[in-house]
């Protein structure tokens, strides 16, 4: 039954605009929304709070399996971990970098696989991540791979963090994004790549609205 529920996967590197596009497309279609990156970031928060070593794969996998996460249904993008709002904590670069490292552990990815697939509920799902179309929902009828140059993605991230009042360096952000790209591409389990049947979109010169329209057209043209 579950595999008959339509899924649009939106994969791509950090800062490509996946989250903004996926949330907007889900709202337009009236579908459920999965931010898989937020799940890994929530695990990073939980590991820090529970004092679990970032090198202890089995303990991290057990922690991943125990996560109790709730995504806010509204546009505020609130995320609750064990009933505590962690929305502000998961947006830091430190959290993102730790999440990327934890995601390289096969046991962690396996523990979170069923949790992610559980978001596939009627009437449909828009799933945002790195391996949604290749590993988590390989049978999804609609797939997008959203990318942009490292420089453009770093500038977008820089502007986001400055708006939040954070003191950040554009050069440092660019280096971190390039390092995260390399780590995501080269990991042995579920490396970052476009699914063979995905529509590849370079958002470097596109507005947010243009990206949303292209994603919607992928669903509506079928």
UniProtKB/Swiss-Prot annotation:
One GO molecular-function entry: dCMP kinase activity
Subcellular location: Cytoplasm
Key word Ligase present: no
An example Gene Ontology biological process: pyrimidine nucleotide metabolic process
A cellular component annotation (GO) from this entry: cytosol
CDD domains per UniProt: CMPK
EC number: 2.7.4.25
Taxonomic superkingdom: Bacteria
PANTHER family, sorted: CYTIDYLATE KINASE, CYTIDYLATE KINASE/PANTOATE-BETA-ALANINE LIGASE
Stated name of the protein: Cytidylate kinase
UniProt gene name: cmk
């Amino acid at each position: 039954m579950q595999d008959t529920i339509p899924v649009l996967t939106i994969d791509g590197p950090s800062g490509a605009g996946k989250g903004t596009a996926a949330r907007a497309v889900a709202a337009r279609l009236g579908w459920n929304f999965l931010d898989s990156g937020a799940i890994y970031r929530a695990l990073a928060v939980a590991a820090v709070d529970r004092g679990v070593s970032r090198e202890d794969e089995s303990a991290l996998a057990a922690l991943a399996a125990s996560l109790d996460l709730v995504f806010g249904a509204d546009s505020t993008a609130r995320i609750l971990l064990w009933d505590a709002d962690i929305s502000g904590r998961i947006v830091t670069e430190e959290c993102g970098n730790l999440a990327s490292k934890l995601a390289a552990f096969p046991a962690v990815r396996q523990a979170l696989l069923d949790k992610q697939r559980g978001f596939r509920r009627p009437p449909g799902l828009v799933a945002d991540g790195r391996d949604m179309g290749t590993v988590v929902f390989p049978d999804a009828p609609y797939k997008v791979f959203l990318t942009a140059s490292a420089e453009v993605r770093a500038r977008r991230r820089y502007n986001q963090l400055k708006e939040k009042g954070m003191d950040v360096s554009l050069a440092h952000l660019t280096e971190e994004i390039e390092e995260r790209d390399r780590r995501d591409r080269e990991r042995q389990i579920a490396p970052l790549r476009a699914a063979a049947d995905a529509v590849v979109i370079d958002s470097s010169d596109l507005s947010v609205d243009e990206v949303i329209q292209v994603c919607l057209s992928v669903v509506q043209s079928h």
